């Protein structure tokens, strides 16, 4: 199966949605109660199948001895091996090095997000992995695996200056690291070509400005200027003729689109856009250096395939019009590929090979109890000021409506919710709760104009959108207004605290996970490497603490100062090593609530950080057992007697 480089365009899987779901059906018998461990610590979990560059081996993540690690096998003999990572913590992802003998993966220390790059061998899987970035207190990741150079990888690291990232060429045999691109203090992102040479960079050029520069004539030269919102730019790669750059960019347009930009002139050619939403991700061919597929998410997932041969192969994997497809990996010759096929019930993984039928490699453990899982429906809510808010509703199977509702608020706020399998959503639905997710104003994915509607609207119109979503669910007979919880992590945790303090009459209880309680102290404690990426947007959207009016605005929108207004129970959960939102945010909120005599329960994990996917399964199970007990007490849902 050689994937042709032509640009035959095939739009897959783009559907509309209903703004009004069908009326609640009469309740049938509820499904069996699914054990906590099957959602959050399953021994059957497996994902991330990737074929090696030479096409001879396959590797994936699966469970082993109470944690996730990397398995691999020979495609010819089916012989399976296990890489011993010599750590009790979970592995979440990996990449093949230049051949089938080595894999690369990241690990931090107890969730602190100071990631190190590790190299492990499939030839000696029991040998201790090699730390390629043994620099204490630093954050590193693999920027590029150079296919033509089996001895080196390009690594980004803040080794020299904790606030910015340089590029290093690291010898994976000797661990020698050579600095190849030093950050002058204002570079936000780098692009290297297919041989690992720095070719483009994005610079912070002022409070609301960015500059795209290219390496030309022995130095860096300006190519394009951006404002802050146009800075939603992704540097993808160099074009096949070496004269252009592939970018995902919203410069001069509302939606993020795939562009070709000429290196000499900066002239743009629009290659692909979605008519309704941003293009989120592009798969480039390592062989042809041309785009293979574009991914977007209008309501259900949409995959736009540029290559007609690949499109025909992927079409054979479609189960339904709502099926999502992701290309996970290809070998160097693009004769073999691994593909993820997903629905709202779970995932299946396939090997595509030229001249052969698709071969199933694995399926998520959830497929064994898919019949007990709920359906995720795209919805549209109209806000009080007439804005169309897209989101998702998951109604519990077998329960009468109206019933208890959990408003699940995504973090960010510069991200969005997507359709698909979400273990937290399905866990809550299995306990008898309807789950409502809304992409409130400011969520990414819906264009620049929608994102900018959030400027100045923390604890304002962004929160109004959440309240309007609850009212929508109540008006349609989905939610009992006396049994509504608000639950979120990170920004979503902040939103949960806002809900419990600014609108305490709306919510029966709230769950705040790694949330912000004081916007001023939060900004003062952000990691140094956020100064170029996150900080400018915070200043624009929320407020500038260096100015008196900015400090006043931040404090006015901080739940901490309204702890006395809380009326109902709150559960607060935080990882002690959180690098993004300091654990102090939860500690000070808990102290204020306790001083005011409020009903609050606090759970802290000393060996975790900010991630929703815990490094230790034991912590994940305890977290969700706490949530299960808390929601059962305040909303009346089901709970298990043990893990």
Q: Model segments located where?
A:
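Bacterial Sec signal peptide processing site at the extreme N-terminus
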Residues: 18-29
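Peripheral, non-catalytic segments that deliver or gate enzyme domains
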Residues: 18-19, 33, 37-47, 53, ...
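Short hydrophobic segments within beta-strands
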Residues: 248, 394, 408-409, 487, ...
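Short beta-strand element of the alpha/beta-hydrolase
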Residues: 401-411
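A fold-wide structural signal in alpha/beta-hydrolase
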Residues: 405, 429-439, 601
């Amino acid at each position: 199966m050689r994937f042709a480089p032509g640009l035959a365009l095939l739009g897959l899987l783009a559907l509309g949605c209903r703004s009004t779901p069908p009326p609640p059906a009469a309740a049938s018998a509820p499904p069996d109660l699914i054990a906590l461990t099957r959602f959050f610590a399953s021994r059957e979990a497996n994902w991330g199948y990737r074929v090696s560059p030479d096409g001879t081996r396959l590797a994936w993540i699966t469970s082993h001895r109470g944690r996730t690690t990397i398995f691999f096998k020979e495609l010819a003999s089916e012989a399976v091996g296990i890489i011993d990572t010599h750590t009790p913590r979970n592995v979440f992802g990996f990449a093949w090095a230049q051949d089938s003998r080595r894999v690369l993966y990241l690990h931090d220390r107890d969730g602190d997000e100071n990631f190190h790059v590790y190299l492990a061998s499939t030839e000696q899987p029991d040998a201790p992995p090699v730390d390629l970035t043994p620099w204490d207190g630093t954050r590193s990741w693999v920027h590029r695996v150079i296919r033509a150079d089996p001895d080196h990888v390009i690594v980004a690291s803040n080794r020299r200056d904790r606030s910015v990232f340089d590029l290093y060429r690291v010898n994976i045999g000797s661990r020698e690291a050579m600095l190849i691109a030093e950050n002058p203090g204002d570079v936000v992102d780098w692009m290297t070509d297919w041989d690992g040479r720095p070719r483009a960079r994005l610079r912070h050029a002022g409070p609301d400005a960015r500059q795209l520069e290219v390496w030309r004539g022995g130095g860096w030269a300006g190519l394009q200027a951006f404002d802050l919102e146009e800075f939603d730019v992704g540097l993808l790669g160099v074009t096949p003729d070496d004269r252009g750059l592939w970018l995902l960019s919203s410069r001069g347009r509302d939606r993020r689109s795939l562009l070709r930009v000429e290196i000499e002139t900066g002239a743009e050619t629009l290659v692909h856009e979605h008519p309704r939403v941003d293009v989120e991700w592009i798969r480039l061919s390592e062989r042809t250096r041309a785009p293979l597929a574009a991914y977007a998410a209008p309501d259900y997932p949409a995959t736009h395939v540029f290559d007609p041969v690949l499109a025909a192969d992927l079409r054979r994997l479609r189960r339904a019009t709502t099926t999502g497809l992701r290309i996970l990996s290809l070998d160097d010759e693009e004769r073999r590929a691994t593909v993820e096929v997903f629905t709202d019930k779970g995932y299946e993984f396939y090997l595509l090979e030229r001249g052969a039928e698709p071969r199933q490699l694995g399926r998520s453990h959830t497929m064994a109890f898919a019949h007990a899982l709920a359906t995720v429906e795209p919805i549209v809510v109209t806000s009080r000021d007439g804005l169309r808010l897209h989101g998702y509703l998951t109604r519990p199977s077998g329960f009468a409506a109206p019933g208890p509702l959990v408003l699940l608020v995504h973090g960010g706020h510069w991200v969005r919710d997507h359709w698909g399998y979400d273990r937290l959503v399905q866990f809550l639905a299995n306990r008898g709760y309807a789950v409502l997710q809304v992409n409130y104003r400011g969520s990414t994915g819906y264009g620049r104009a929608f994102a900018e509607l959030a400027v100045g609207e923390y604890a304002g119109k962004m929160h109004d959108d959440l309240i309007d979503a609850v009212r929508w669910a109540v008006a349609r007979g989905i939610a009992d207004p006396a049994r509504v919880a608000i639950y979120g992590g990170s920004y979503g945790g902040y939103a949960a605290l806002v809900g419990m303090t600014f609108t305490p009459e709306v919510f029966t209880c709230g769950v705040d996970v790694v949330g912000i309680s004081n916007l001023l102290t939060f900004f003062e404690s952000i990691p140094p490497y956020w100064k170029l990426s996150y900080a400018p947007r915070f200043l624009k959207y929320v407020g500038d603490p260096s100015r008196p009016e900015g400090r006043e605005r931040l404090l006015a929108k901080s739940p901490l100062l309204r702890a006395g207004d809380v009326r109902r129970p709150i559960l607060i959960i935080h990882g002690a090593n959180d690098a993004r939102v300091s654990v102090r945010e939860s500690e000070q909120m808990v102290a204020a609530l306790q001083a005011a005599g409020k009903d609050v329960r606090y759970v802290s994990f000393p060996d975790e950080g900010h991630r929703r996917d815990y490094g230790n399964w034991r912590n994940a199970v305890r977290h969700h057992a706490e949530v299960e007990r808390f929601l059962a007490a305040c909303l009346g849902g089901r709970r298990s007697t043990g893990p």
